[in-house]
Amino acid sequence: MKTFTAKPETVKRDWYVVDANGKTLGRLATELARRLRGKHKAEYTPHVDTGDYIIVLNADKVAVTGNKRNDKIYYHHTGHIGGIKQATFEEMIARRPERVIEIAVKGMLPKGPLGRAMFRKLKVYAGTEHNHAAQQPQVLDI
């Protein structure tokens, strides 16, 4: 019997919607990354994108434990000399709440073209509204 290898054109991708309200950031991100990779499926193949599409709602209400709300710092560099910028978790939630979940999940995905393709299937929204109703997403309880 030969080993099964999933083909990109035969992979069935479902759409799921997840409510991040009150969920712990890291625990939510690990499950999202696992489902974006497709590791929950029997036909998982490491070099093929077998994951599903995931819509995350209420990104502004995600929880962190301890004092990370004030202590966790996000860094980025503008590319110019002395251009290192930083923002706390609280500032990130106030400015761009979607980015917090995106950064957490992106760090858990593979680096390279396959990881970028997986990351494109993640749709994060700060509120309860999304524009993917035509895809008929199923509610996923994490």
Curated annotation (Swiss-Prot):
InterPro entries registered for this protein in UniProt: Ribosomal_uL13 (IPR005822), Ribosomal_uL13_bac-type (IPR005823), Ribosomal_uL13_CS (IPR023563), Ribosomal_uL13_sf (IPR036899)
What terms describe the molecular function in GO for this protein?
mRNA binding; structural constituent of ribosome
UniProtKB keywords:
Ribonucleoprotein, Ribosomal protein
| Gene Ontology cellular component annotations, sorted alphabetically | cytosolic large ribosomal subunit
Entry's Gene Ontology BP terms: negative regulation of translation; translation
Tell me the subunit arrangement: Part of the 50S ribosomal subunit.
Annotated family: Belongs to the universal ribosomal protein uL13 family.
Q: Which NCBIfam families match?
A: rplM_bact
> What does it do?
This protein is one of the early assembly proteins of the 50S ribosomal subunit, although it is not seen to bind rRNA by itself. It is important during the early stages of 50S assembly.
Q: What is this protein called?
A: Large ribosomal subunit protein uL13
Q: Can you name the source organism? A: Pectobacterium carotovorum subsp. carotovorum (strain PC1)
Native organism taxonomy: Bacteria, Pseudomonadati, Pseudomonadota, Gammaproteobacteria, Enterobacterales
**Gene that this sequence comes from:** rplM
